[in-house]
């Protein structure tokens, strides 16, 4: 009788350790996923900043603005250059 109780308690202790380790691994995986999402979002923002400036975006020369936009000389923002071609 004592050996059955001992084996049952040992089994429960082992199960608790395995579940705890699994929960820790799950938390670490969740942290990695969230970190990857934040890094991807940061990279996307940086990529947008490296690209051209959109309409009414700040600029210092025409090359800063997107296609069909030019840098307004007085206000230093991108405005339409009057073209329609693709």
Curated annotation (Swiss-Prot):
Expressed by the venom gland. InterPro entries: Huwentoxin-1 (IPR011696), Huwentoxin_CS1 (IPR013140). Residues 22-50 form a propeptide. SUPFAM superfamilies: omega toxin-like. It is found in: Secreted. One of its GO terms (molecular function) is ion channel inhibitor activity. GO terms for cellular component: extracellular region. The keyword Membrane does not apply. Disulfide bonds join 52-66, 59-71, 65-78. Keywords: Disulfide bond, Ion channel impairing toxin, Knottin, Secreted, Signal, Toxin. Residues 1-21 form the signal peptide. Ion channel inhibitor. Belongs to the neurotoxin 10 (Hwtx-1) family. 17 (Hntx-9) subfamily. The presence of a 'disulfide through disulfide knot' structurally defines this protein as a knottin. This is Omega-theraphotoxin-Hhn1a 2.
């Amino acid at each position: 009788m004592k050996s059955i109780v001992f084996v049952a308690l040992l089994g429960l202790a082992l199960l608790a350790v395995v579940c705890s380790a699994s929960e820790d691994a799950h938390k670490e995986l969740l942290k990695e996923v969230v970190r990857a999402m934040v890094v991807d979002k940061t990279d996307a923002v940086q990529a947008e900043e490296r690209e051209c400036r959109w309409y009414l975006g700040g600029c210092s020369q025409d090359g800063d603005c997107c296609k069909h936009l030019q840098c307004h000389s007085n206000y230093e923002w991108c405005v339409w250059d009057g073209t329609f071609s693709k």
